[in-house]
């Protein structure tokens, strides 16, 4: 029996009017088209919207952090200096940015001033006196610390008496109050632990806790409204704690630097006897621990890196990194390669730690790579040739030096004195670095200030 041939040709689609089968096929074709064009259903849930926004913000934040980190890595090699002329002021010890164009500074000659980085204009700010200003004026100390509270509405610094704490209101710099009954020696460092509470560290080995209450602020406003002469309150300390004293050298237990960890409410303190102290700092000060530093000479600066949960301590030639959660023998230290001049200032910005030295150098340490940033090869005409692999180092300008009797008798045969970087600070954008200081020898009178951008 012969097999019936089967055609492999497809049948032509039926016309629209060909009956129910044709309608089914046509319906099937439309359904296929519909399936191809179908989009995900729109979720109108508030929870879904918030989660989607959170993911988007996380991506944007991650990208922003990468961008800021890259900028922090590349910026130091691009910075150029512009010096400011400060007249006859002596050694800038402290500085903070007030806004995008103003920096407030304190000097060894006890002068508080604001410099406009765009116009170079200098404006001096009246310093605040004790309620009983009959004490002997202390020479050679000055203003060692300036700190802004977290909301940037109050500024804390030293007073006319370097043992006292002075509080100003921002942005007007109107006086608010003076804490003048706490320390018996100079204030070396200040740290805000909240918007209204600050801690001062003194050369007498004590730490004072001060509170600027709403009552003090209200009365300050009322006084300013009725008087054109600056009037301010006088406050007393809320707590006064002595740091532990080493038996072998009790006279050198001077609180030199403070740094606050806002996440854990912990306050780090460095004393000149070579110890790091950690305190719980909320409504009072409670000691948590004390540990001997691996390099214990000239420990004069301290900074806290919140992202890395470590404190950076400067010494005569090293920067040491302390994590209070780790044993003391795990402390890592790096050498600045400028022995003898000392680390005078230190700060965190992103993953870069900026180090200011007594030789007028700025060094940049990458905490992720655990090494200093290095020079790039430069082929610019007329520039000093630099070897690849050398640490990137920026050097401060000439500044001003008073050729007084001390200079004539002891230093006149020396052609040039580097300006120690006693203070430096980045602006909010991280693209401008204010640097200031003066000659390292205590007997020399001079100053330096510059904007690196």
Curated annotation (Swiss-Prot):
Keywords: Cytoplasm, Cytoskeleton, Nucleus, Phosphoprotein, Repeat, Ubl conjugation pathway, WD repeat
Record carries keyword Phosphoprotein: yes
Record-level Gene Ontology MF annotations: ubiquitin-like ligase-substrate adaptor activity
Ranges of the WD repeats in the UniProt entry: 138-178, 182-220, 250-289, 338-375
Record field: compositional bias (Basic residues): 1-12
Localization, UniProt: Cytoplasm; Cytoplasm, Cytoskeleton, Microtubule organizing center, Centrosome; Nucleus
Involved pathway(s): Protein modification; protein ubiquitination
Pfam families in the record: Beta-prop_DCAF12
Major place of residence: cytoplasm
Region annotation (Required for nuclear location and interaction with MOV10) ranges: 1-38
Modified residues (Phosphoserine): 15
GO biological process: protein ubiquitination; regulation of autophagy; ubiquitin-dependent protein catabolic process via the C-end degron rule pathway
Keyword Ribonucleoprotein: no
GO cellular component terms given for this protein: centrosome; Cul4-RING E3 ubiquitin ligase complex; cytoplasm; nucleus
Region annotation Disordered: where it falls in the sequence: 1-26
Quaternary organization: Component of the DCX(DCAF12) E3 ubiquitin ligase complex, at least composed of CUL4 (CUL4A or CUL4B), DDB1, DCAF12 and RBX1.
Entry similarity comment: Belongs to the WD repeat DCAF12 family.
Biological function: Substrate-recognition component of a DCX (DDB1-CUL4-X-box) E3 ubiquitin-protein ligase complex of the DesCEND (destruction via C-end degrons) pathway, which recognizes a C-degron located at the extreme C terminus of target proteins, leading to their ubiquitination and degradation. The C-degron recognized by the DesCEND pathway is usually a motif of less than ten residues and can be present in full-length proteins, truncated proteins or proteolytically cleaved forms.
Protein name: DDB1- and CUL4-associated factor 12
Organism: Macaca fascicularis (Crab-eating macaque)
Gene name of the encoded protein: DCAF12
């Amino acid at each position: 029996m012969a097999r019936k041939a089967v055609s492999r040709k497809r049948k032509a689609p039926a016309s629209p009017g060909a009956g129910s089968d044709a309608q089914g096929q046509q319906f099937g074709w439309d359904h296929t088209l519909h399936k191809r064009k179908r989009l995900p259903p729109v979720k109108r849930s508030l929870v879904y919207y918030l989660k989607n926004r959170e993911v988007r913000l996380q991506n944007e934040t991650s990208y922003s952090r990468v961008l800021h980190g890259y900028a922090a890595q590349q910026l130091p090699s691009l910075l150029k200096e512009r010096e400011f002329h400060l007249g006859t002021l002596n050694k800038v010890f402290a500085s903070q940015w007030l806004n995008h164009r103003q920096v407030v500074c304190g000097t060894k000659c006890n002068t508080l001033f604001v410099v406009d980085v765009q116009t170079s204009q200098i404006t001096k700010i009246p310093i605040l006196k004790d309620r009983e200003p009959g004490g002997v004026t202390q020479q050679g100390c000055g203003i060692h610390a300036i700190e802004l509270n977290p909301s940037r509405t109050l500024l804390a610094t030293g007073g006319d008496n370097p043992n006292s704490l002075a509080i100003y209101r921002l942005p007007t710099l109107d006086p608010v109050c003076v804490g003048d009954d706490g320390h018996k020696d100079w204030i070396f460092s200040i740290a805000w632990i909240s918007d209204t509470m600050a801690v001062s560290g003194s050369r007498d080995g004590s730490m004072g806790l001060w509170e600027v209450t709403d009552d003090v602020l209200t009365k300050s406003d009322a006084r300013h409204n009725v008087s054109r002469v600056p009037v301010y309150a006088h406050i007393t300390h809320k707590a006064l704690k002595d740091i532990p004293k080493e038996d072998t050298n009790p006279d050198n237990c001077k609180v030199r630097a403070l740094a606050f960890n806002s996440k854990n409410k912990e306050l780090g303190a460095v004393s000149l006897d070579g110890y790091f102290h950690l305190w719980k700092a909320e409504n009072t000060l409670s000691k948590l621990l004390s540990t001997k530093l691996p390099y214990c000479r000239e420990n004069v600066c301290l900074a806290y890196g919140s992202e890395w949960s470590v404190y950076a301590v400067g010494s005569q030639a090293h920067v040491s990194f302390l994590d209070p959660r780790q044993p003391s023998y795990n402390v890592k230290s790096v050498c600045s390669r400028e022995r003898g001049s000392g680390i005078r200032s230190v700060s965190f910005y992103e993953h870069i730690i900026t180090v200011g030295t007594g030789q007028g150098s700025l060094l940049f340490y990458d905490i992720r790579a655990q090494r200093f940033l290095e020079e790039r090869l430069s082929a610019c005409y007329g520039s000093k040739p630099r070897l690849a692999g050398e640490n990137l180092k920026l050097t401060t300008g000439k500044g001003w030096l008073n050729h007084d009797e001390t200079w004539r008798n002891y230093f006149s045969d020396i052609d040039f004195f580097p300006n120690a970087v006693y203070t430096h600070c980045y602006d909010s954008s991280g693209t401008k670095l204010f640097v200031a200081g003066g000659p390292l020898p205590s007997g020399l009178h001079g100053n330096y200030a510059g904007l690196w951008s």
